[in-house]
Every structure is written in structure tokens, then in C-alpha cells.
Amino acid sequence: MKKRIVTIFSVGIIALSITACGKSSGDSSEITKKLDFDIIQENLDTAFKNSETYSIYNSCDIEYDSDGNDLNIIVAVNDSIDPSLSVDYAKYAISTINYEAQRQVEGLKDYSNSDNYYGGLFDDVDAFITVAPVSASNEDDYFIFESIPRGSNREIKLH
């Protein structure tokens, strides 16, 4: 009987430990529920349009799927862009999206280009980023086609 109680107690503690370790500093759904992705989209477009550095930008679209807590980022650039610059466009989009999320939710961590840390929003969502020329008709034509699992520091590379 004593062994059975100890076993049940041990299993309970292990289950609680696993559950506690799986939580981030904030519940993902609680963070993203506070965000207005339409405002983030508008401000991202404005940031690209007003930037002299990213003048070959054509459009950017973000789509958030709350069921999977997924964020899709699609940046369309003019066909004349040097493909090697598309990594800069991707990082600019990510840093701007995180900055706009920080304006809406207190406590999200900053983006850091030096160590491929994409910021607090990207700790809580799985992201997928595509940078492609406007003439792209299939995946083979994309410059960047990269997934960024939540909390990872995966480097963005050319496709």
C-alpha cells in the first residue's frame, strides 16, 4: 500500500514538473490574444514604404493563425533586387513585427540582430517567412522560404 501511494505521488510530481517546464514566461495564446495584427500589418507596410534602405519593397503580408499559433510573413520585392539583400528584408520585417508587438504587449523582449534572436513575439509563435520577387510563380523562385520555430535562433538563409 505504501509503495502504491509513493508511486502515485511520484507520478503526480513528475507530471506537474513536466507541465511547469513546458510553460514560457507568458502563455502564448494570452500574448497573441492581446495583439491587433491589422495594426501590426499597417505599421509594417508604413515602415517599409518610408525606408530608404528597403526601397525595392513591393508589399508585405502577415497572416496569423490562432489555431496553431502560427505567423506567416510574406514579403514581395521588385524583380530587380539582388537576391542576397532578401535576408536583410526578412530581418527588417521580423524586427518591425516584434517592435510593433512590443508596443501592444508590455514585457516582450527586444529583437537582436547580433545573435539571430528575433524577439519576444517569436518566442511564442511558430513563424514562416517568405521573401520573393513579385514575378515568382512557385517555391523555386523564392529567395527565402524559411520556418522559424518558436523560441529558436535559426539563422535566415537564402533558399
Which positions does each model-derived feature cover?
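Mature extracytoplasmic domains of secretory-pathway proteins
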Residues: 68-125
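Polar/charged, Gly/Pro-rich intrinsically disordered segments
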Residues: 50, 106-159
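Bacterial signal peptide processing site
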Residues: 22-24
